[in-house]
From Swiss-Prot:
InterPro entries: PolyA_pol_cat_su. Polymerase that creates the 3'-poly(A) tail of mRNA's. This is Putative poly(A) polymerase catalytic subunit. One of its GO terms (biological process) is mRNA processing. CDD domains: polyA_pol_Asfar. It is an enzyme of class 2 (transferase). It catalyses: RNA(n) + ATP = RNA(n)-3'-adenine ribonucleotide + diphosphate. Belongs to the poxviridae poly(A) polymerase catalytic subunit family. Highly divergent. Its EC number is 2.7.7.19. Induction: Expressed in the late phase of the viral replicative cycle. Keywords: ATP-binding, Late protein, mRNA processing, Nucleotide-binding, Transcription, Transferase, Virion. It comes from African swine fever virus (isolate Pig/Kenya/KEN-50/1950) (ASFV). The keyword Nucleotide-binding applies. It is found in: Virion.
């Protein structure tokens, strides 16, 4: 029986050929050049895959083949007006079917010409935009890979986000490859920071919260140490923090005693409904912080405990010891990056703990390799699937049948309610959480003869309050 001839399945190669042979290829390339000049003129900051690719070009590497059409994703502190302005510019230069529309991601506007997307503009509050680190590639500002790491960790933290193309299926592999390239070419230097610790004791409900922050680091470190002793590996010499903890629990609560840095003595927990937990624990809410982009959710602070809200999302978690719930290492890494961005005075401390968490994962991987050699494939898979050190799809469940309600889903539901004029039943879980769609940016099509919309306000829509601002509450 004759065999089929070997075929070259170089997908990127044929994608480039297909792009060049498109009927409107010349028009698209011309439009992208207009976009490029617009980005340079407005000093906008590229992010996403193109920013990673350009940063890698500076190191002699890449993630995209040479000559691939750029996919311009950019941050702007005034993204709605900038999107409208770019649409007007393209229309004035003779491009057809120009428009700008709201993207699925609510803080993003998409600009198209001839039904081809040529730019995505995403909102970044000016207090963040003016301070984030950047690099320059061919006169274009690109977000620094240190900041880009946060977006890559984020996908691993919420595996069921963005249905029906959940991140676990659509992003895990791609983002892991990109992260490894960033770590290879732009590692964060290890700069030891000496910390003074104090022994703190907290009593918390263990079934509905995940331990986070510096306490989670302590639990993960000691879990690693126990795994090391099980594998009979000599103790490692390390400059990274080695905090200890102890606990006891009953049917409802866990009493946790843990070494905490004196600079950050508050316990951090992640939970689906922080206000309900705070009320049940008899605590007094003292401060509320708005989200910091996508990298930190709303934070509800009490005197000794800070609650990170995971409402509408399913957070990946790990289980250690006697079914104690801790956040996944990826969420912990994201927390330390967020701390470095949001609190410049303690940037060195947070980056030291970030590298310490990476070290934990590196050592855990070496121990898992030992276990794999000593056990059957079935036994190893069972062990690895319960390990707190690997990527996981185990999530912190909410009290509803479904937990993942993205802003896009809630906006779509609000549109349906408005068009049908049939309000949701008061008993519906989302009845009090539908956004006011009249406060969202309007789509704009310059060729239709209508004036550019002018009534959008960032302040009037909570979905755009993502600058991390904290508000103290009256006692």
């Amino acid at each position: 029986m004759s065999s089929l001839p070997k075929t070259d399945f170089n997908v990127p190669k044929y994608q480039l050929i297909a792009q060049k042979r498109e009927a409107n290829a010349a028009e698209i390339e011309a439009a992208l050049e207009v976009v490029r000049e617009f980005i340079i003129k407005k000093k906008l900051i590229l992010y996403g895959g193109i920013a990673i690719d350009y940063a890698l070009h500076l190191k002699g590497s890449s993630i995209y083949p040479e000559g691939e059409r750029p996919d311009f994703d950019m941050f702007s502190p005034n993204h709605v007006e900038d999107a409208y302005e770019l649409a007007d510019l393209l229309y004035e230069k003779g491009f057809k079917q120009v428009g700008t529309v709201r993207a699925i991601h609510v803080q993003t506007m998409r600009v198209r010409t001839d039904f081809v997307w040529v730019a995505d503009l995403s909102y970044m509050p000016s207090n963040i935009f003016d301070t984030i680190p950047t690099l320059t590639y061919k006169n274009l500002k690109i977000i620094h890979p240190d900041y880009q790491r946060a977006g890559l960790h984020l996908a691993f933290c919420f595996p069921f986000d963005n249905p029906p193309r959940e991140d676990v299926f659509s992003r895990f592999k791609k983002d892991l490859q990109r992260y490894n390239l960033i770590e290879k070419y732009y590692p964060i230097p290890v700069v030891p920071v000496k910390s003074t610790y104090e022994n703190k004791t907290f009593s918390i409900p263990f079934k509905r919260v995940a331990i986070h922050g510096f306490a989670a680091y302590a639990l993960l470190y000691q879990t690693l140490n126990e795994l090391r002793m099980t594998c009979k590996v000599p103790e490692w010499k390390t400059e990274f923090p080695q905090p200890s903890y102890s606990y006891h629990k009953n049917d409802k609560n866990i009493t946790l005693t843990v070494d905490m840095p004196k600079a950050y003595p508050s316990l951090v927990l992640a939970t689906y409904n922080p206000e309900e937990i705070i009320k049940e624990m008899g605590l007094h809410l003292t401060e509320i912080c708005e989200p910091y982009m996508d990298y930190s959710p709303p934070i509800f602070k009490t005197k000794d405990i800070h609650f990170f809200s995971t409402m509408f999302k399913e957070l990946a978690i790990s289980m250690i010891q006697d079914n104690i719930i801790v956040v996944s290492p990826q969420y912990l890494l994201l927390y330390f990056l967020y701390g470095a961005f949001a609190t410049p005075a303690d940037k060195a401390l947070f980056l030291f703990y970030y590298n310490a968490t990476l070290w934990i994962l590196e050592k855990a991987d070496s121990l898992l390799n030992i276990i794999q050699k000593q056990t059957s494939p079935e036994e190893f898979m069972k062990f690895a699937n319960t390990s707190p050190f690997v990527l996981t799809t185990r999530v912190l469940r909410c009290s509803q049948d479904r937990c993942t309600f993205s802003p896009a889903y809630r906006i779509s539901l609000a549109n349906d309610v408005q068009q049908s004029q049939l309000p949701l039943p008061k008993t519906h879980f989302l009845s009090n959480f539908l956004p006011d769609i009249s406060t969202l940016p309007y789509n704009y099509y310059p060729g239709k003869g209508k004036d550019r919309p002018t009534n959008f306000s960032y302040e009037k829509n909570l979905l755009f309050n993502i600058g991390g601002k904290c508000t103290q509450l009256a006692m």
